[in-house]
Amino acid sequence: MADRQPYMTNGIQAAVVEWIRALDLEIISLLLSRAWPMALLATSELRWRPTVLTDTDNVVRLDRRQRLVRWDRRPPNEIFLDGFVPIVTRENPDWEETDLYGFAKNNHPSIFVSTTKTQRNKKKYVWTPRNANRGIVYQYEIYAPGGVDVNDSFSDASPWPNQMEVAFPGGIQNIYIRSARELHNGRIQRIWINPNFLDPGDLEPIVSSSRTPQVIWRMNHPDGGHRDQRSERSASSYDDLMYGGTGNVQEDTFGDEPNNPKPIAAGEFMIESIKDKNSFLDLSKNVNGGVIHSNLYSGGDNQIWVFSYDDNKKAYRIQSYQNSYLYLSWDSNASSKEMILRGYTNSGSNNQYWQIEQTGKNYRLRNLLNLDMIITAQDKPSAFGGKEVIVNTEISNSNTKISQEWKMIPFDFRPIIDGDYNIFNVDLSNQVVDFSNQPDLLVHGHIFCDNENQTWHFTYNSTYHAYKIWSGRKSNLLLTWDSNAASKEMVVRAYTESRSKNQYWRIEQTGSKSYKVRNLENSSMILGLTRVSTPYGGLNLMVEDDSDGHSDLHSDWDIKPIFYQDIPDGDYNIFNDNFPNIAIDFTNQEGSLIHGHNFCSNNNQKWSFVFDGKRKAYRIKSGVRSNLWLSWDSNASSKEMVLRAYTESGSSNQYWRLDEANDGSYRIRNLQDYYKLIALTNKNTPYGGKELIVSDNKESGNTWYLKKLGEVPLPNRKFRIATKLNYKKVIDSSTSYNLIITHDLNFASSIWELVYDSSKKAYNIYSSDINNLGWIYQNKNFFVKLGNIDGPDHGDLRYFWTIEYSMQTGCYLIRSLHDPANAVGYTDSESVITDTSTYSDNQLFHFILM
């Protein structure tokens, strides 16, 4: 592929599919490159969108600030909740499902989600499908990291260059979707605002029109589920709008309305000063006439304001969220002619109404009584904390005019859905919130053990706009700050329900994997972890005032949903990561010992994974004796660490959980002890294999690749088969009908057609040059022969081959079905032979589509 300089990218950070987001960038790049078209190999390569890029208007921006668009038939109640989930989400997707060029050209079902860049050339242009004016359609606005730049990847060969496509493997999380336009037969009905959007800052405002309602979305919004009937026809129909062949670039004229009097939606906002970052309009005294000032973020109701638009006055009233009787007001009638702002009950005066004016990326708030008077941030300290805010005439000085500019931030109290979670500390690696049921009911931080002590069930209360967090260990106990204790203790305990506000928590998203957890009793109090040890072997968990700036309090949390069913039930081979030709094997030997053995593709090495919903773990059944299960005999008097195949006992030592690594492999952990993993040693067993143990040590052989039996890795198509080390060297045949490695000279004899036989779960590999001729296995260390495989003995296993994809290398291994221990490789003299499979470079190949 083309040789270009390395660059920084956010890659797959946006992915909503967890297994894709967890992969190393190198691994996912190999996965996407395996289907690269032959004709483009020398002139193109996979190009991720860089972290810093030159946008279509030639302005240098961060990738998170480049405006992308996606046309979709699915409504906000689905997209703002789940994000853009690709059609294909399963692990080990097949060849076509990871084919970037095929996806860009034909939009077939895949792991990708398509978007298009906003194109700017004095005016704004957007690629638009020709059927966007038919039925109910949504135009989603996206600011996401990473993704693959399709035009940059394929250059002049890009299938639809005017689409300016950015494709996202694994989809796009909801936090990167800012808004959506809802269109009915081409007419914009409303603009949806996503309150969970993670704003990178410095974005242009959402384009709006005074004639179009703006709506802040909430879960299960009654108007948020409008769906066109055609989107229900098939699983893939919602993606038809992004097919590059059915659209063109059109000018986006929506919102070209000077002095739009209604630039923001009605709803709940925080009003942030542009002059003083992280300072917000604040009504700290909840009384009639209470002074409004600018103060550092506290997460409290006193900094939340409810905007409502009056069509008659063409202005907004701004109501305090903490006290619905109080409104943002300028007491223009005061005898002192004061300029400060206060919270007053409704008077009907125009000094309680505000016109909101866009100033590029921000807003000014003008008082309706006197439109010359603008809300202005001051440097003067306020007696109530923070800084004073007044109304003042317009400032023209370019250096100080930002004191009259404000950012409106939609506020949402429900960033996560109800369910079970682990609460990981971001700063202190592998530490989670833990309740071990000790006598003092103390909740603390502890090393992650994947047990019910560390499971927390979040339930949202719409009255309090906050969460109750229930213990997984004891379902009647809630995470509680005992704020009423005489000692004014700051620790956190697990108490039965009291209906006190100190048992409610607000979850505030601060990053893609980062949250603050605030107590509703006092929103300045945040949950944090210190390095101080507790008597129970963990770390001290407490609440402290956010404004105190405690450097020793680690208060950022990654709240991870708990999901244990990583793979579908079915039959698998379990290959070792470090020794890729060794699989877990049970040969029914004395003592029921299970060991690692060179792969031979028989039932000894077949294992059936069966998920148990109650235990939330897998049982792993032998393929050779269906009444035996993969077991660690943890109860043996010798405390043995070996694995055995035993009949069902019901013990947790027969259950296993999968822990995904970042290269697509898994650690297999025993349910009885989270730290006990299946590991392969280099020690020989009496039965000809390698010893398997369960161990809490970090052996190098404790990660495994699961290959599902019966999956078809490649389609029935024609390919050149190139070596791993040099894609310009391919498998061809000699005049004596032996397979050889030659330079690719575009000969027909180096084109091979795959034909899959579903009964044998293997391929015939035919010559495209001579009818009926195909690959024939002769024996170990013999040439692979080209001969007639369509005769009376067509079913001979020597004519069939299995093909395995190697996630680590991005290449394929070709095994003989007749003798699966042997794989196709080549010698120094470039003869193609079969030998014991080792996954060495000379046994790995690229399949290049013709």
From Swiss-Prot:
Motif (PN (phosphate-nicotinamide) loop): 117-135
Keyword entries, A-Z: Apoptosis, DNA-binding, Glycosyltransferase, NAD, Nucleotidyltransferase, Repeat, Transferase
Stored PROSITE patterns: RICIN_B_LECTIN
GO biological process: apoptotic process; DNA ADP-ribosylation
Region (ADP-ribosylation domain): 1-233
Outcome (variant: residue 181 to A): Considerably reduced DNA-binding by catalytic domain
EC numbers: 2.4.2.-
Phenotypic consequence of residue 165 to D: Reduced cytotoxic activity
Enzyme class: transferase
UniProt note on tissues of expression: Within late stage larvae and pupal stages most protein is found in fat bodies.
Domain of life, source organism: Eukaryota
Reaction(s) catalysed (UniProt annotation): a 2'-deoxyguanosine in DNA + NAD(+) = an N(2)-(ADP-L-ribosyl)-2'-deoxyguanosine in DNA + nicotinamide + H(+)
Domain Ricin B-type lectin: 267-409, 413-560, 564-707
A GO MF label: 2'-deoxyguanosine DNA ADP-ribosyltransferase activity
Pfam families documented for this protein: RicinB_lectin_2, Scabin-like
Record comment regarding domains: The N-terminus (residues 1-233) has the ADP-ribosylation catalytic domain. NAD(+)-binding or the presence of the linker do not alter the structure of the catalytic domain, however in vitro the presence of the linker masks the DNA- and NAD(+)-binding regions and thus prevents dsDNA-binding by the catalytic domain.
Protein family: Belongs to the pierisin ADP-ribosyltransferase family.
Described purpose of this protein according to its UniProt entry: ADP-ribosylates double-stranded DNA by targeting the N2 amino group of dG residues; 10-fold less active on tRNA. Induces apoptosis in a range of human cell lines. May play a role in removing unnecessary or harmful cells during pupation. May play a role in defense against parasitic wasps; its habitual predator Cotesia glomerata is only susceptible after removal of its eggshell or the surface of the larval caudal vesicle, while other wasps are damaged by this protein. The wild-type catalytic domain (residues 1-233) cannot be expressed in E.coli as it is unstable probably due to its toxicity.
Stated name of the protein: Pierisin
Protein source organism: Pieris rapae
